[in-house]
């Protein structure tokens, strides 16, 4: 397809003349059939809803086709409308547009659907089993058409993948405002999502899937590296001061979990990651994100022993069920140093977790046709997995929950994961590592994408970012010196670690000062021509301010506000009028539907003074909103960080907490009994 044909296809939107039906491509990793949940009347409504995108002349043909999709897959994806052109992040100049910001958003959307990047590209799922960009291909086509027509004085409203339309606004307003799976709180249970998604009225956007900010497994690998490195440091003794030879065991080689083996190798440990889906394991192996594939535990166990003995930095994928792996490690008394889990347990009944003793294929069939039996198998599997993990922790393994709802779903299954006082016996990684060491000080997963598509532009941004962090490090207080040192090492090594999958993007944990100064350095480089095209700034929603999640991002908030969502909602509103190019707010993401509220942003910078102003105003709020909230929760690191920010930033005044003597309070209560 020529560039002109590609651009014409984008501008056409939903074509008046329907394209030919497309065969089901079995070479692509597809989503499993979804649960059959709709009543006969609701099935009528689902098809009626889908036909809204098409003129009546096509309804008879498409109604039959959509009914078949609903029967076979549990959803209406409109495969017929999947474009013929290759899906990937093109250089920004190749997108037809009236507004440069809109072209950047088109680039980001296509990256999320690139088959090298997305988990189930033909079902518009980027990662996590159900993290959707759109619900169907009509929504994709119509959205791209709107973006190609958008001016600097319009804003596109996106309702769970549905483009509501272009509305008049102004150049400083966001070009796109995204909401995903925002529902009335009483209707936020898993079956509510299944029903609403099957009806075509809501979608689970995960975090960066539905907000057009996913950058492949690199997007989580820096945070995973930080986590593994600091978990390993918890195992250090006077005689053991490095991670070499340590064994790290976990599961998952999907869009997010696929970062684990690379993070383990960067950290210097032996990583063994189980993955039940052969296509997912093969994909990560071909991309170089995992070093070895093993299909037999009889072969894997001796290989693990040798790698640990020889202190290799190596990653291995076990293509099989993680419970079999844990039980074998426990039975063989293999000394595991670090353990975690990244199965998609936010989505346990629809492909996020595969039970032991049931094949991958049989599980996919059972979850759709016998959901009650499948649930029983999953819960029994979780109980067995926890039993094996408990045996290994009794021998010294440090196990942490990776914020995927593992402990939550294991507890619901009756597994032995509860400790004293009704608390989980194992910490989340945010409680032990990410929260007190990073989020409380404002460090989080800042990221950027070079819209030129040129590797040399990305190399320059790496150098600029490293220079900024090194300058900050010279006068940094001791309490954040270690974080800065790790992040400087990361960005200096990023190119050599071959992290790019999809767009020319980079992830870097940075605080408010670092993010702002790095972005300003990029903006100057665009202005003087050293960078050849605009840069998109963004972050994961898994950040200082972006997510309220009591089992993950806000699990180290202990003042009782961990169940509130004011921070995430305030954050997206504040970003929207301080300069974000697009903003998003989601229900779910990470731990699951009904358990989280999270949001994010994208900002296109183009070398202008307007971009510099937006950088200063928006990035300050985007980080310090969360620090202020964490400070009010009496987190010591956050109190220190917000005091420094108030000294640095004129006009910033934050309410600080006063410490109360808990023993005094207890005595008062006793006196009043």
What is the role of each PLM region?
Residues 1-198, 202-217, 371-521, 525-538, ...:
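Long, compositionally biased, glycine/small-hydrophobic-enriched stretches that function as flexible linkers
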Residues 247-250, 314-318, 400:
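Short catalytic-loop micro-motif centered on adjacent basic/acidic residues
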Residues 535, 539-570:
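Small-residue-enriched alpha-helical segments and adjacent helix-cap loops
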Residues 205-229, 233, 239, 244-247, ...:
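Catalytic or ion-translocation cores adjacent to nucleophile or general acid/base/metal-coordination motifs
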Residues 270, 335, 398:
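Residue-level detector of anion-binding/catalytic polar loops
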Residues 278, 320-323, 342-347, 403-409, ...:
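Glycine-rich beta-alpha junction loops
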